Amino acid sequence: MAGTTLPTPLYGLYRQELGFGELMVTVVFAVYAVGVIVALLVAGDFSDKLGRRPVLFAALALSAASAGCFLLEGGLPLLFSGRLLSGFAAGLFSGAATAVVLELAPSGSGGFAATAANMGGLGCGPLLAGLLAQYAPRPLILPFAAHLVLLAVAFALTLALPETVRPPRPRPALRPRGMEVPREVRPVFVPAGLACFTGFAVFGLFTAVSPGFVSGTLHIGNLAVSGAIVFSVFCASLVGQSLTGRFGAPVALPLGCLGLVVGMAQVGLSLLLSSLVVLVTGAVTGGIGQGLAFRSALTAVSARAPEEHRGGTISALFVVAYLGISLPVVGVGALSTGLGLRNAGLVFSGCVVVLASAVGAQLWRTRKAEAAALATAG
């Protein structure tokens, strides 16, 4: 997963070298989400039919091809190709790798181990790229060469993994899994989906355009700082997800929305004050809110969905989440062409605050109404 966020601190260098603006940066980033969504819809259950290891090997091969596109430095076409391949790989990894971790981890620790591997990888990508780009030669080459080395290690480890699935015989046809949200799930799915959309929009902001904020608004040209800020968002999300069990999904979901509201208000304030400290504080607060909202939304939707429709319902939730990580940041890029990146960031922060506030308030009212109904029935 580190490869999917590896280019984050490097977008400014690509912008200088290829001569495109912030809008194109966000479009290049958003292509990744298209790849993830396509992979989830087309191949989300392939590891159940083919086995975990074949799908993991395919994802590793796609990741290597993505790194190769960036290494060739062939301009925008290869940047788009690299991001699309990276999205395909992430879509395959999200299902097969998560399942393997859940199946092989010690009892009771699988959920946290899967979350830690996912968020840890996403966070380490920009941190590694930022450090190498800032303090080592060939900033647009070395990060992806290092990624290929890590992929070789991952390939060797995957060879050593036991297969945890016995593919059915005869092998069933490989068809797109599609999406389906049953009628009885929709009252839970709609607010949960909006919370996921909002939380992943925060991820999109930090992974696509926060390096532009750091260099253009805060006037900090150190790429390692940009990478560390994105790293902090994903680490904070991991903390938020680990806290969800303590509160329970009905409380954690509106609490996550509150974290998103406070975090994005801090991000907006950091742009007004040109303050790195306030930006980092907003990144951590928003990351915790995202983690709480996402994990509790996934728990609530999974618990409500009938078993025969659970896979399609969860796929639909992930599609909503990845639309959130892509569409809003393209809007930020478009706004930045006329308003400038600082003002576009302020508009984005305000929109997230309004949406998260509305969703959180509705969730809290629903929870209180359900509690009152239970008390009356008792």
Predicted regions and their residues:
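C-terminal transmembrane helical hairpin of 12-TM major facilitator-type secondary transporters
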Residues: 252-295
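A late C-terminal transmembrane helix in Major Facilitator Superfamily
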Residues: 296-349
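Cytoplasmic helix-loop-helix junction between adjacent transmembrane helices
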Residues: 82-118
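Helix-loop-helix hairpin linking two adjacent transmembrane segments in secondary transporters
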Residues: 107, 112-159
